[in-house]
Amino acid sequence: GIVAQPEQAVSRLPLLDAGRRQQLLADWNPPACAAAFLPVHEVVAANARRWPDAPAVAAGGAVLSYAQLETRANQLAHQLLAQGLPAGARIGICLPREPSLLVAVLAVLKAGAAYVPLDPDYPPARLAVMAADADLAALLVDAVTRGCFADQGAHLLQIDAMQEELGRCPTS
C-alpha cells in the first residue's frame, strides 16, 4: 500500500489485496463456456419434441407447427435420399418464401446435402447461370419456378407435385 511505498504514484498502487483481486476477477467471473453447436435441423427436431403443437413457421397464410415442420422435412429428406444423391451433394432450392421453403432447407440438411438458395424473383437467365455454376445434383422447385430451369441438366424435383409420394415416406 501507500505506507510501504510512499514514493510510488497513486495510479500505480494496488487497490485490492491479492485475495480480493482473485475473488473479483476469477471467482465471480468464470470464463464463459462455449454453447453447444447444433445444426438448425437438429434444433428444429428438438423443438418438435419439446413443443410439437407450437407454431414453428407462418407465411403466406399458412402455419406449420414444429411437429408438422419436422414430419414434412423428414419425408422430403427420405425422398431425397431415395433419389440416390451422394452425401454432400449440392441441391438447389428455388421456392417462394412460404413454409415449403423451410421444409426444403431442413430436408436437404437432414439428407446430408448442401443447399444452394436460388431466389425465384431473379430473372430466369440469372437463375440458370447460378444453377449451372453451382453444379447442382438436384433442384427443388414448385410449379411456378420449374419453368426457370427447363434447360438445366440438374434433376428437377417439383415438391408441390410430390405430395402423394411424400405421404408414403417415413415421418422420422
Region locations from a protein language model:
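Carrier-protein-dependent adenylate-forming modules in NRPS/ANL systems
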Residues: 1-15, 30-172
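Intrinsically disordered, low-complexity acidic/polar and Pro/Ser/Thr-rich regulatory regions
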Residues: 16-23
